[in-house]
Amino acid sequence: MQHALRYTEELDSKLKDAMAMLVLHLVARPWAETIAWTASIRAPRVNLFVTGSSINEQITGRCFTEDVKEPPHNLFYSQTTVADKEPRMSSLEVDTSDPLEWVEKLYERSEQRPGRIFRLPDENYVLLAAQPDFDEDWFHSLDAQDAAKIERVEETKTLETRRFRWHCGCNLDRILPILGGWRDKPDDLFKGEPAISIQCPRCGAKFSVTRDMI
């Protein structure tokens, strides 16, 4: 297995921002959820995908830059999955290509509560999610400097700790069923080659597949 994905500095930064936002959002949500976000952006033309789970404390994602259709508007999709329940879907038209602004709009439109997000130095981020009976004037007056020192000037308490890591969980056992439809026509799939390379749609990991594996 190999990844070998290389993005432009701009796309790499957006992917990191989106993954950071998803981790903070997962921490602000109940434990049993798996959440996936997809953003379809006009400029730069890219489909950005991130997904994570508090159950497994893992997150992964990638950018799709090849054969991407230009959407009429920048679109942001969110899917929340809980075991034994139908996934909850929402979609938003977003004005910018900034993941932080997407997530603030997600809170405004889909979470039914406001959220404030701040990008701090040294790749640190803050997400403040409003709770019932919150002080609206105080909440909306905060800036990045206020957010950076909030633990020092406000009374706070750690409710729980979740430790996320970059991990997709993909492997050949999960990838091979995708090729099940080619089992009866391997010549069309391999085209004379001894092996082919297939890619995980979630993280971009590449796997080498030979005829005897199908």
Region annotations inferred by a language model:
Residues 1-158:
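Interaction interfaces in information-processing and related assembly proteins
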Residues 130-214:
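Cys/His-clustered metal-coordination modules, chiefly Zn-binding fingers
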